[in-house]
From Swiss-Prot:
Coiled-coil blocks: none
The UniProt record lists the keyword Translocase: yes
Organism of origin: Rubrobacter xylanophilus (strain DSM 9941 / JCM 11954 / NBRC 16129 / PRD-1)
PANTHER family: CARBOHYDRATE TRANSPORT ATP-BINDING PROTEIN MG119-RELATED, D-ALLOSE IMPORT ATP-BINDING PROTEIN ALSA-RELATED
Catalytic activity field: D-ribose(out) + ATP + H2O = D-ribose(in) + ADP + phosphate + H(+)
Function: Part of the ABC transporter complex RbsABC involved in ribose import. Responsible for energy coupling to the transport system.
Binding, ATP: 47-54
SUPFAM superfamilies: P-loop containing nucleoside triphosphate hydrolases (SSF52540)
Lineage of the species this protein comes from: Bacteria, Bacillati, Actinomycetota, Rubrobacteria, Rubrobacterales
Subcellular locations according to the entry: Cell membrane
Major localisation: membrane
Protein name per the record: Ribose import ATP-binding protein RbsA 2
């Protein structure tokens, strides 16, 4: 079946929600929403963070009960009081944070919550269990050691285990929440192939993602939620990216990228002959005041490693970094911050934030000594700084005393950026700053980058999204296999030129490598 074709062939929906309303205290999360999933279709569910997507699917998954409205499964009325009841009805949930048991084997994870095969003497038939697990994975075109602990697998392979578990339970519907957020280009391609296989089997897939290019590639229908309300359900073929963004956030895609190029000023940061064995070599790079330099390249090109070496997380084998003309001592993030350089990591949850800490504590952590005298912290000035930066970056989802773990991905990223701005940096190294966040939050971060450049700060923007690189950069530097392979001014930079420099392939064939653009 072609993407965008009418799925289901008039069949009864796998499940259908009618007039769903869910309230939490005085807050209405979703109101009067209709949604259905047909056999063998990929139905994309999109909207900004807080639009109600997760709430709606948690009702389907048995985690929440609706306050109003009804649920049908296979044309029959249904009401789930637990996830187990939802699973028994043939609905499998694959959350972004996979619910696997890392210490258990692949085979054991596939049988969690399911009766394990028994020998005639009543013991667990481990041989049969491993064999069936291997067969189910093989049906997905995957060969894994089913005896290995899940913790040893890559994120992509853990995801395949979750999908195989759903199939072992004979799921008729699979709900995937941001399934490619942590995958490389190749891994995402493999996932798309598996989703196509699920469609051929007649399994319905609900696909939740912020990545519009993926949605238009694999979805048959798209449902848009905004502020807890249903905006529209339409065939994917009847929409385009600009229209979809307008439905999601109320303004067109053309208004998303906020870049007002400024005349670059003095050199702020200079990299000379920087190298690190096995990662990158002979890198020369210059950043000027008021300039956004995009750093493009494929997975493994060395971009993240370069940024971390500039900041001091990694130590170079050769070369030097200069800030305002003075050599920056290698291997010292503290010294880098003192000189006005700040790195915002791609992995915000594990490297950029302390999840149990409050928004305030995360923002002020890097400047706490500023408020400390004789071992005591002056809480008033600390609160004032955190509140001012949280307000300036429009951090939403709670107050500055709430745990940062409660915020959406986009708001967590704003907190990481606020922490960097607390240092008043001259140079910002931004590693995938919009990865995994919704389109509205992306727009706000683009405006922030433009504002920072307008204030005279230098920004190094690492991104795997070529549209982001092209729209936000004054210059584009390309890395390939650890070396600088190209540099383009704003007027010279095109998608084709960047991909040619990133792959070493000249001409139109370079475009086929675009899917591999990454860290």
């Amino acid at each position: 079946m072609e993407r965008g074709a009418a799925p289901g062939g008039g069949k009864v929906p796998v499940f259908r929600l009618r007039g769903i309303t869910k309230r939490f205290g005085g807050v209405t999360a979703v109101e009067g929403v209709d949604f259905e999933l047909l056999p063998g279709e990929v139905h994309a569910l999109v909207g900004e963070n807080g639009a109600g997507k997760s709430t709606l699917m948690k009702i389907v998954g048995g985690l929440y009960a609706p306050d109003e409205g009804s649920l049908e499964v296979g044309g029959e009325p249904a009401a789930f009081s637990s996830p187990r009841e939802s699973e028994a009805a043939g609905i499998a949930m694959i959350p972004q944070e996979l619910d696997l048991f890392p210490e258990l084997s692949v085979a054991e994870n596939l049988y969690v919550g399911r009766r394990r095969p028994r020998t005639r003497w009543g013991g667990i038939d481990w041989g049969r269990m491993r064999r069936e697990a291997g067969e189910k994975l093989a049906s997905l075109g995957v060969g894994l050691d089913v005896s290995a602990p899940v913790k040893r697998l890559s994120t992509a392979n853990q995801q395949l285990v979750a999908i195989a578990r759903a199939l072992l339970r004979e799921a008729r519907a699979v709900v995937m929440d941001e399934p490619t957020a942590a995958l490389t280009g190749r891994e995402a391609e493999r996932l798309f192939g598996i989703i196509a296989g699920l469609r051929r089997r007649g399994v319905g897939v609900v696909y939740i993602s912020h990545r519009l290019e993926e949605i238009f590639r694999i979805a048959d229908r798209i449902t848009v939620l905004r502020d807890g309300h249903l905006v529209k359900t339409a065939p994917a073929s009847a929409l385009d990216p600009d229209e979809l963004v307008r439905l999601m956030v109320g303004r067109p895609l053309s208004e998303f990228f906020s870049r007002h190029p400024h005349e670059p000023g003095e050199v702020v940061l200079e990299v000379r002959g920087l190298g690190r064995e096995g990662e990158f070599a002979d890198v020369d790079l210059v950043l000027r005041r008021g300039e956004v330099v995009g750093l493009a390249g494929l997975i493994g090109a060395g971009r993240t490693e370069l940024a971390q070496t500039i900041f001091g997380i990694r130590t170079p084998d050769r070369g030097e970094v200069r800030v305002f003309g003075e050599v920056l001592p290698p291997g010292s993030p503290r010294e880098a911050m003192e000189r006005g350089v700040f790195y915002v990591p791609e992995e915000r949850k594990s490297q950029g934030l302390i999840a149990p800490f409050s928004v305030k504590d995360n923002i002020t952590l890097s400047v706490l000594e500023r408020f400390t005298r004789f071992g005591f912290v002056s809480r008033g000035p600390e609160r004032e700084l955190a509140g001012r930066l949280a307000g300036a970056l429009s951090v939403r989802g709670g107050g500055i005393f709430d745990p940062v773990s409660r915020l959406s991905g986009g708001n967590q990223q704003k907190v990481v950026l606020a922490k960097s701005l607390a240092r008043e940096p001259a140079v910002l190294l931004l590693d995938e700053p919009t990865r995994g966040i919704d389109v509205g939050a992306k727009s706000e971060i683009y405006r922030l980058i433009d504002r920072l450049a307008g204030e005279g700060r230098a920004v190094l923007l690492i991104s795997s999204e070529l549209e982001e690189i092209l729209s936000m950069s004054d210059r584009v530097v390309v890395m390939r296999e650890g070396r600088i392979s190209g540099e383009f001014g704003r007027e010279e930079a095109t998608q084709e030129r960047i991909m040619a420099a990133a792959t070493g392939v000249r001409g139109p064939s370079a475009a086929v490598a675009e899917e591999e653009a990454g860290r």
